[in-house]
């Protein structure tokens, strides 16, 4: 058995810990793990002990390394013993982790007892070689009309949910988790990066109630935790997802909420390590940090990892370096706007701003492509006419333009949909709409066949049959 290398703490500055390894031939490598025992006082005034993991970030000379703590550092003292792990922090993987909640170091935090995992994989792993990656394109049905029709997702793809605060990113993610688990029986990995602890708890309780928890593993590094935790928790989740892809041959979904907080934590870590900031105060290694996470998300010949990442846009400025660096890696962008949220259209996805490089005839087929393009054309024309309507009113439009406006309003409302995870708020049962039903329903709306139905009949329904039924309930002639 290899000798355990030990050092001692010489300095603690917030989440940064300097450790001295005297008389060792080789210092721990960058990104390798260290551990120590933290002694602190809990809320009730009782002393407790827990293992604190750290990650080596710099070699600072004189046999010293600078490490980033993966947890609170209160209770650490100078001279305290630190143990070198011999490599990166290792994470439990396998079916044993399903239904559980973990922290960044792979320790269970749901008070459900220890995890009897048969295998432990390092937190950092290289992305698959190019020869191992799959070139097959397979569309993933989400059951959400606006996504399936206008920005299709592929297995092994990367999707960004862009939006400011409070426009519905987390709810949309919860619905996608629900639909994948319930209708596809796929495994999901949920990574909470720097988001609200309350939301993490709510999501766990909702998944427990809806029965999808056995198909899911959760890894949390929430906003109350040190930057090292928020900066590395995405890698922990990816290691777990990679096991399901590479060993079990599964198509896995990884949900990262919020990838911007990962960048933000990287900026904090960078500042703590004394690096000079780059544009807008972000870390100089911004693109490298983002690339390390994104390159691990891909399809191989064995299985796939599809990533759906919520991206907070600071001050709704899409040109900010953080969202911009994430943009470069995405196959599809789903943009949520406050304008639609204010109109009560949920999901508040902008059908014109949102894109997918797989919305092309060779991937989705001619019929799907033509219906999607016609929907976009009508909505684009409606957007152009809105300025004229605001100044001159509807009366000044030609008959053709009036028909386009009326149809566009119905399409806009028809792109809304009641969610299963929001039933308790809306009082409306959630709808999962199959892709063929979505295409057929919009194709019929585009013909003008249902222009006579009231606009509100199209609001918060599933298929066109649901809209007809709602119109009947409203007393309209069908």
Curated annotation (Swiss-Prot):
It is a peripheral membrane protein. It catalyses: ATP + H2O + 4 H(+)(in) = ADP + phosphate + 5 H(+)(out). SMART domains: AAA. It is found in: Cell inner membrane. One of its GO terms (cellular component) is proton-transporting ATP synthase complex. Its EC number is 7.1.2.2. ATP binds at residues 163-170. It holds the Pfam family ATP-synt_VA_C. Keywords: ATP synthesis, ATP-binding, Cell inner membrane, Cell membrane, CF(1), Hydrogen ion transport, Ion transport, Membrane, Nucleotide-binding, Translocase, Transport. One of its GO terms (molecular function) is ATP binding. It comes from the Bacteria. Belongs to the ATPase alpha/beta chains family. Produces ATP from ADP in the presence of a proton gradient across the membrane. The catalytic sites are hosted primarily by the beta subunits. F-type ATPases have 2 components, CF(1) - the catalytic core - and CF(0) - the membrane proton channel. CF(1) has five subunits: alpha(3), beta(3), gamma(1), delta(1), epsilon(1). CF(0) has three main subunits: a(1), b(2) and c(9-12). The alpha and beta chains form an alternating ring which encloses part of the gamma chain. CF(1) is attached to CF(0) by a central stalk formed by the gamma and epsilon chains, while a peripheral stalk is formed by the delta and b chains. This is ATP synthase subunit beta.
